[in-house]
Amino acid sequence: MFIDKVNISKEEISIYKKSNPMKTRKIIAVGGSPGTGKTTLFRKYMENKVFQPIEPAKLVSAMYNTERDLYILGKYEEGEVFAGTDRLSMAVQPAVQEWIASHNCNILFEGDRIFNQSFLEFAMGLPNTDLQIVFLNVPKQVLEQRYKDRGSDQSEQFLRGRETKYNNLLSNFDLMSYITEFPNTNLEEQGKVIAFLEEHLKV
């Protein structure tokens, strides 16, 4: 039996749930350069589903859906342009890994904070885990327009660094078989990514 202590609306409650430790749980990591639409995609996915903001472990904020036993890592507050794991502490990765290793719930996340080689290789080595890595692609000219539209102040050096990071991940031999790439320039393409998430996280 797993016991999760979570905070919901500042009221401390305990959730007791029987869970089969041998079940195959899903971890889906969504990455892409800044402006590829990760946060917008996740807000769309959460529409018409009931999620509660919780803190299942120290430093670890998430949105929890009981029906799917699904944690979306990070913060998603109204009106915030930057959300997801990018809103978490720079030091969050050890806490996230410790928590995930002791639970077999489903995990979905986006953002740069833990979308890195060490975390993905950690997830790849977890028992009874179906890991999927989704990479969003958007043409450079579309990205540049999106940066202008949202008033992004991220430097060219920062953006080049992120591009190099993702190129290295895409060429990582150990991770290749887990990666699915999607274009994400319009609503139709966004819908295909959401359909992928729905299929892999269905009840």
Where are each of the predicted segments found?
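NTP-dependent small-molecule kinase module
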Residues: 2-5, 10-14, 171-203
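Hydrophobic anchor at the beta1->P-loop junction of P-loop NTPases
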Residues: 30
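The conserved Walker
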Residues: 34
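A conserved segment at the C-terminal end of the G1
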Residues: 40-51
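Short beta-strand-centered segment that lines the nucleotide-binding/catalytic pocket of NTP-utilizing
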Residues: 51-65, 73
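Conserved nucleotide-sensing/catalytic segment adjacent to the nucleotide-binding pocket
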Residues: 66-113
